[in-house]
Each structure stands twice: as C-alpha cells, then as structure tokens.
Regions:
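A short glycine-rich, His/Asp/Glu-containing loop-to-beta-strand
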Residues: 48-52
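Charged, amphipathic alpha-helical segments and their flanking helix caps
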Residues: 1-40, 55-172
Length: 172
C-alpha cells in the first residue's frame, strides 16, 4: 500500500509503462506507430494507434477515510488500425485491443515493482468493457479507421495512516 501523496500519478506511470514496454522489437505491440497518452492531441498520428484515457477515480466500496481505502481508476484504450477492407481493419483493431489487454496483464506487476520497490499499490486489474466502438475519420482521407475500445479497471489501495505519517514527517 502507498499513500495518496504519491499514489495516483504512479498508477498512470505503471499503465503507460505496460504499453511502451511492449512497443519494442518482438514486443506484443511492436507494430504500433502512435501511442497517445493525453486527452488531446494536435500532432500527426499514424496507425496502428493506441489512445489511452484515464477516467475519474472512485471508491470501490463505501468511502471511508479509515486506515485504508480501496479505489478504482478506469483506463480506456481506443485501438485503431487502417485497412482498405473495413472488415479486415475491424478484426485488426480488435486484435490490437486484445494485445493491449495482454500487455497490461503481462507487465503491471513488474512495472509496479520497479516504480514502487517494496510496495504494493495495485490490488488487481479487471476488464470493465470491450467494445468494437465504430469508426473515426482521418483528416485528409475519405476512409474510416475502425476503433475498438477497452476499459480496464485498476483496483488499488491507499493507506491514509501512511499519508498522515508522511505529512507529519514533511512538517518536521
């Protein structure tokens, strides 16, 4: 368990690491050309593309500021692949979404151990939703790119007592 003072940003780092770690030669996502990990992107994108969005964190059970609190942070991955044949492109975008899930499952424990040595923040990761969402249009092209969306819930624990101790130590 970690404190809320360092916890939330580390969850984002861990999930991003799971993806970038597999975007290497012989990685599960070696074919991915663009990984967008911000809410808004003005730059040029090439497909295959993975666009990640972190949704609001909520209490997993009734909010109680006691010693520990279980929280859930959903991460949405929108995966798109272009192909002249829309049916093939749709299958390829679903395959990319499957590989994103595998990348997170394969790497989250190692990434967490490297970023937070000796600490365990993430309890588990669960699948919330898997949906072939439809298509997006690409500026300058008349073609559409099929997109498959995946939402993974990162379930984590915050230790409020540890937060208070860290705050008190910083005041000394």
């Amino acid at each position: 368990m970690v404190s809320i003072l360092t916890g939330f940003e580390n969850i984002n780092k861990i999930i991003n690491c799971c993806i970038t770690r597999e975007m290497t030669e012989n990685g599960l996502l070696e074919d991915v050309e663009t990984f967008v990990n911000t809410y808004y992107n003005e730059g040029q994108v090439e497909e295959p593309i993975i666009w990640i969005t972190q949704h609001p964190t909520t209490a997993s059970r009734q909010a109680d500021i006691s010693q520990t609190m279980e929280l859930t942070t959903p991460f949405e991955f929108d995966c798109g692949v272009y192909d002249v044949d829309l049916e093939d492109a749709n299958m390829q975008s679903q395959n990319l979404a499957n590989r994103v899930i595998l990348s997170v499952l394969k790497n989250w424990q190692t990434a967490q151990a490297e970023l937070l040595p000796g600490q365990r923040m993430i309890k588990n990761i669960t699948l919330d939703r898997y949906s072939p969402m439809g298509y997006v249009t690409v500026t300058g092209k008349s073609d559409k790119v099929p997109v498959t969306g995946v939402i993974l819930n990162v379930n984590h624990i915050v230790n409020w007592t540890l937060c208070c101790r860290q705050l008190n130590n910083n005041e000394d």
